């Protein structure tokens, strides 16, 4: 076979580059070629795929089976021509992209055995419960595995696999829509637009029912000897949507930590984890269907309607008592809320306080984040050791009492960024859609401030507030020299963070009479950053693979059974040095890759 991954895989788009590199790293050269071809040409038959990729048909078919198993490829059989078409599915490769973080999180949360189960499922794509347990002979081990599988499934980390999971969502929608439209009769009293919209609404209902079918308790579980377990015939796979919700929880927690403080962010993290499983998906099925929702206003209204429905159903609503039950034992919130109402010094009989003497030396009380922003007027003759704070409104006897947690929730709901919304007294919900805008904005601003400097950061913030401005206006507003402003504008333009608009003052558009305005558009700026991060991730993976290929002979030698464990005795000093450098280089690159991936996740789905 002479086929190689085409150069277009790297140049076509940043996503194409990343997905092809991931496929090559985890699944091999042939899988990368097939993925690249399907991204370039769209859906193809096996024969067309073989012709365009120059891979033998037999090898194409065997590779397609593995890729379908791993959810990297979807297939669709046309009813009229009976041909089977294959199309690219990013879900499988995204699981490979996050596999390390997925396994690490499951290990920390559920233990090593649960992490092993998730790792096995990721490796094979999906599996039947009875097939997974049939090779285990010890009944006690089988019982433990069944309990772990039930726990992971109940918490949403595993999901049921159905036929619709292997079919392209566009083809599935189109088939249902055409059937519904055909069964919706034309009428002289109903316009064609109304008829089409009516058919769309009916199709949405059918499509939702199709995706949610097969999830009844009778089909998923069975009770044997009074013990509940998953049905042996159930086919399960890892649920990527559940992990994306977990990453969103981490992003929101980090934002709260940066804006409010560590202890409040811990309380917020508990609140987010409480409703995480039932929170709205980051990738809703309707938004993946081409041409269904094109208007940004309509898309925003649709996303908000989903969130509002979850609030109405009480799925993303919690109260203070719920948090008290799940608060970690090592979380100590005592004396974390310091205000005028909570710091009233009581009368101390050992030393009288003269109320007639004016206060000349006010004491400062440090808050959790170290800011001296609260001033309490205390008598200078009263030492700090003799103060007895009467906490009338907060209970400091317990590390996380109801009143303490409630005050932290008040902090989260009353700030500039609405981390929480108080529906009724003591009952809260999380405005996910609005908060993700703040997450992107704050991380973007921080990135500019740390990489380009304070002047660029000030300039961009000024431009955001002014919407549209020229150099002179910007210089006067942020109090910088025009030369400095010009230099910073040049840096921002090179990174596509701002746009330039030419404004001619004469009909002939003479350059001497032309001036320029600047603006910042979030969508284009975020899009450029996202593509840059995506390309960098692919480039790092390619570099790791490249220096492994450059030292292929040495690495193959180390993999030999007689060499493993005896490297220091059997390898030359130069080979040991090269091996150590390779290891350090790979560790550094993987660390860089994970840091970039953290930003990539924030700006994904912007």
Curated annotation (Swiss-Prot):
Task: Specify the domain of life of the species encoding this protein.
Answer: Eukaryota
Give the start-end ranges of region Leucine-zipper: 533-554
Which GO biological process annotations does it have? termination of RNA polymerase III transcription; transcription initiation at RNA polymerase III promoter; tRNA transcription by RNA polymerase III
Coarsely, its chief localization is: nucleus
Task: State the UniProt keywords alphabetically.
Answer: DNA-directed RNA polymerase, Nucleus, Transcription, Zinc
Q: Choose one Gene Ontology CC annotation of this protein and give it.
A: RNA polymerase III complex
Where does the protein end up? Nucleus
InterPro entries linked: POLR3C_WHD, RNA_pol_III_RPC82-rel_HTH, RNA_pol_III_Rpc82_C, RPC3, WH-like_DNA-bd_sf
Q: What are the recorded GO MF terms, alphabetically?
A: DNA-directed RNA polymerase activity; single-stranded DNA binding
Q: Give the family per the record.
A: Belongs to the RNA polymerase beta chain family.
Physiological role:
DNA-dependent RNA polymerase catalyzes the transcription of DNA into RNA using the four ribonucleoside triphosphates as substrates. Specific core component of RNA polymerase III which synthesizes small RNAs, such as 5S rRNA and tRNAs.
Subunit structure as annotated in this protein's UniProt entry: Component of the RNA polymerase III (Pol III) complex consisting of 17 subunits.
By what name is this protein known?
DNA-directed RNA polymerase III subunit RPC3
State the organism of origin: Debaryomyces hansenii (strain ATCC 36239 / CBS 767 / BCRC 21394 / JCM 1990 / NBRC 0083 / IGC 2968)
The beginning of the lineage is:
Eukaryota, Fungi, Dikarya, Ascomycota, Saccharomycotina
């Amino acid at each position: 076979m002479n086929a190689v991954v085409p150069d277009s895989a790297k140049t076509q788009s940043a996503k194409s580059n990343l997905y092809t590199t991931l496929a090559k790293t985890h699944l091999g050269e042939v899988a990368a070629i097939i993925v690249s071809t399907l991204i370039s040409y769209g859906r193809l038959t096996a024969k067309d795929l073989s012709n365009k990729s120059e891979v033998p048909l037999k090898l194409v078919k065997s590779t397609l089976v593995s890729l379908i198993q791993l959810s990297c490829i979807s297939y669709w059989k046309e009813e009229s021509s009976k041909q089977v078409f294959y199309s690219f599915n990013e879900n499988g490769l995204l699981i490979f992209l996050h596999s390390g973080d997925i396994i690490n999180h499951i290990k920390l949360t559920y233990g090593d055995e649960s992490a092993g189960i998730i790792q096995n499922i990721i490796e094979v794509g999906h599996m039947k419960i009875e097939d997974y347990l049939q090779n285990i002979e010890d009944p006690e081990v089988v019982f433990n595995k069944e309990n772990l599988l039930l726990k992971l499934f109940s918490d949403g980390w595993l999901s049921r696999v159905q036929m619709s999971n292997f079919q392209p969502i566009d083809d599935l929608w189109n088939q249902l829509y055409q059937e519904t439209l055909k069964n919706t009769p034309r009428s002289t009293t109903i316009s064609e637009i109304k008829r089409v919209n009516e058919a769309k609404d009916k199709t949405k209902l059918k499509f939702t029912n199709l995706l949610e079918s097969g999830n009844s308790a009778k089909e998923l579980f069975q009770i044997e000897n009074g013990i509940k377990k998953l049905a042996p015939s159930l086919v399960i796979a890892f649920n990527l949507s559940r992990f994306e919700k977990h990453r969103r929880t981490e992003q929101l927690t980090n934002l709260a930590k940066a804006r409010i403080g560590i202890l409040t962010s811990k309380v917020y993290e508990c609140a987010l984890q409480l409703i995480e499983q039932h929170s709205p998906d980051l990738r809703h099925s309707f938004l993946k269907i081409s041409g269904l929702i094109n208007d940004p206003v309509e898309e925003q209204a649709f996303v908000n309607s989903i969130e509002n429905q979850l609030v109405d159903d009480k799925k993303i609503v919690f109260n203070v008592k719920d948090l008290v039950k799940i608060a970690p034992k090592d979380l100590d919130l005592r004396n974390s809320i310091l205000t005028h109402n909570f710091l009233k010094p009581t009368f101390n009989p050992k030393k009288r306080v003269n109320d007639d003497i004016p206060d000349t030396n006010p004491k400062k009380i440090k808050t959790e984040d170290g800011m001296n922003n609260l001033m309490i007027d205390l008598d200078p003759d009263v030492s700090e050791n003799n103060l007895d704070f009467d906490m009338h409104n907060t209970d400091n006897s317990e590390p996380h009492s109801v009143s303490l947690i409630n005050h932290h929730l008040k902090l989260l709901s009353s700030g500039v960024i609405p981390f929480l919304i108080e529906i009724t007294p003591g009952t809260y919900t999380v405005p996910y859609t609005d908060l993700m805008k703040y997450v992107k904005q704050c991380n973007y601003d921080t990135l500019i401030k740390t990489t380009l400097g304070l002047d660029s950061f000030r300039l961009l913030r000024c431009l955001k507030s002014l919407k549209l401005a020229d150099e002179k206006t910007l210089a006067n507003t942020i109090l910088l020299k025009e030369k400095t402003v010009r230099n910073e504008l040049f840096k921002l333009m090179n990174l596509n963070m701002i746009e330039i608009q030419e404004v001619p003052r004469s009909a002939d558009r003479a350059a001497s009479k032309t001036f320029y305005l600047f603006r910042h558009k979030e969508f284009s700026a975020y899009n450029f950053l996202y593509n840059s991060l995506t390309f960098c991730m692919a480039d790092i993976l390619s570099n790791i693979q490249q220096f492994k290929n450059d030292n292929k002979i040495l690495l193959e030698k180390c993999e030999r059974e007689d060499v493993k464990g005896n490297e220091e005795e059997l390898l030359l000093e130069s080979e040991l040095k090269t091996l150590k450098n390779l290891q350090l280089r790979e560790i550094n690159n993987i660390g860089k890759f994970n840091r970039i991936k953290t930003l990539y996740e924030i700006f994904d789905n912007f």
